Amino acid sequence: MPSDFKFSVRAHQSITHKYKLQPVEEVLEAFERMKQICGKLNAEVMHLQVPSSFELTKTSIINLRNVLSSVSLQKLRLALEIRGVRSSQLPPELLNTMREYNIVHCTDLSRGEMPAYESDILYTRLFGKGKHNVYQPTDEELSEIDNEASSGKSEKIAMSFHFVRMYKDAARLKTYKQSGKFPMITRSTGLASLEEVLSEDARFPSAKQELIRSQGWKIFDLTETNRIHVGDLLGKLPEATYNDLGEVAERLKRVMR
């Protein structure tokens, strides 16, 4: 791997999901094991993901404080992600604890979730605007994420891509950062690009709404410099059941004239 490669490590779910950050022996032992793993990998950040079922009560916040006061993090930083709770809804007691222990507030910039406070490290996990992680961001959305991440005073920015096509989308943003331009994602433009994308796994016969549901989250090259969601174009189709990709393309040719 590259000499400048940096690991980040996600804490074992027993800490956050099974024992819900209670100051019990199992949690403290798991923390120690995770610290050892981070040390072996020279990881600067350990990510803690708290499930949406986690209740932010006075007791749970005290439990978190007790855990943090019982472990020696040394140089290891924690990035805490509270699933299902927006930054503005986090209790002041929790935010005070996070600041006291120099914890990074992890959010999803792709869904417009900014951290509750700034840290020297910005850590974001990107899932997109679809259901779960079924989404592919447009160039404009990636650019907006980049602008949001760069707008503060953070010295380091860590983006963890979780879109369905996470590797390709991360590479797209990297290309943009290096060249100032987003790359094409197919070998052609317009309907030919759409056909290339749909040919990957679209099933036929299929009704219009089923095509939009299964394929609409993807993007294609409308032009060399403009990528849009497949659903934006499929939405122009007449309501019908389509037997093959050629029939879809032929109908779209008519509505695009």
Language-model-derived ranges and their functions:
Residues 1-186:
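Residues lining hydrophobic/aromatic ligand-binding pockets adjacent to catalytic sites
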Residues 185-257:
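Charged, amphipathic alpha-helical regulatory modules used
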